[in-house]
Amino acid sequence: MWDLNDSPAAEAAPPPLSPSADDSGASSSSAAAVVEIPDDADDDSAAVVVVTRQFFPPAVPGGGGDPAPGNARAGWLRLAGAAPPVAATGPAASAAVSKKSRRGPRSRSSQYRGVTFYRRTGRWESHIWDCGKQVYLGGFDTAHAAARAYDRAAIKFRGVEADINFSLEDYEDDLKQMSNLTKEEFVHVLRRQSTGFPRGSSKYRGVTLHKCGRWEARMGQFLGKKYVYLGLFDTEEEAARAYDRAAIKCNGKDAVTNFDPSIYAGEFEPPAAATGDAAEHNLDLSLGSSAGSKRGNVDGGGDDEITGGGGGGTGSDQRVPMAFDLDWQTAAARSTKAKFDQNSNHPQMPPVLQVTHLPFSPRHHHQFLSNGDPGTAGGLSLTIGAGMAGHWPPQQQQGWGNAGGMSWPLPPHPPPPPTNAAAAATATAAAASSRFPPYIATQASTWLQKNGFHSLTRPT
């Protein structure tokens, strides 16, 4: 039998490298790993060195010492056997730690926070996030100017504790301006200070280059309109001043302007004009002269008409119909008018006189009476008020009834006249206060004869 201990394989086997390696080889494969590493020292030799590394070192009983040297513990998980890198030290490492941001990474295209370079426009634009929205702060020629705009907006939006690109001491002067403006107004200030305006825009607020080549001033969102046109100007400064004046007039001294509002203080003072008493006095004089002239015309015209009417009433042909315009409700302002139509001579006119509302008084009652008889006035009777009878000559009744084949109705006949003038005045006053026209009804031609009334004829 072969002796296994004296076998050639056993004699050719190399001796173990160390006791620990022999023990680890006897253990399970999960506790050890075998890596073939070429020998760098001898390039010509093709010898293979087997290196066994232990993942979990055995605990040393009865002591807390290190079971393995420090370099062995450091290389537990480094299967390739490379040495650990040396930590970087120096001012560069400390600067990198101090610049670490708690609000996220900076812009990829700029070293400053909140600044981005746009290839299409060729300028540096600044943005800031507020309430989940990105707010545009303007376009600038340099990244440094855009970074300063971002810093000012960040201080306004987030306070002095905000993360900014430069030190807070550089913005001491801007802190005073921020306190007087809202967020929206301060953003407009930053945009006006930017230099990256599109074509046709101006750095002044409310100013735009018109297509005719002049500068247009306008104010937007006023009184429900989209914008209010203020005019065209030759220069930007003139248009900006026009906008400032309009803004101060509409919004007062707190309006946002392009220039210092103090330069417009003298333009909005009230002009040296007449006092209020003098203005009221002039107004009274103008109104008084107008009213006096009208009153004089009314009074003078009334007197002339009365004078002419009196003569015409006595000498005119009584067969001609008369049109009376009597309005004694305004007797305090003007006299009674009696207008006689001398040019009209129409014997076939209807007998209904154009007297629809005749308030009467005893004084005026006697002007239309002849010998005190209320029924006749020179052979011609009139319907006056509601208390006097009306009669016309039969010749006129016959002519009116057959005028052109047309039948004209006779005027109504009121109740019998009162016994005295006082009763007649009372009845007419009641009709005058009601302001209703007298009652007019159409009756047959024989109504007067059936009721016992006869027309009075003019004596020949």
Curated annotation (Swiss-Prot):
SMART domains: AP2. It is found in: Nucleus. Keywords: DNA-binding, Nucleus, Repeat, Transcription, Transcription regulation. Belongs to the AP2/ERF transcription factor family. AP2 subfamily. It holds the Pfam family AP2. May form homodimer. The keyword Transcription applies. Residues 111-167, 203-260 bind DNA. GO terms for biological process: regulation of floral organ abscission; regulation of flower development; regulation of seed development; response to cold; seed abscission. GO terms for cellular component: nucleus; transcription regulator complex. This is APETALA2-like protein 5. GO terms for molecular function: DNA-binding transcription factor activity; transcription cis-regulatory region binding. Its main location: nucleus. Residues 410-419 have a biased composition (Pro residues). Expressed in seedlings, leaves, stems, nodes, sheaths, panicles and young spikelets. Accumulates in the spikelet abscission zone (AZ) via a positive regulation by the transcription factor SH4.
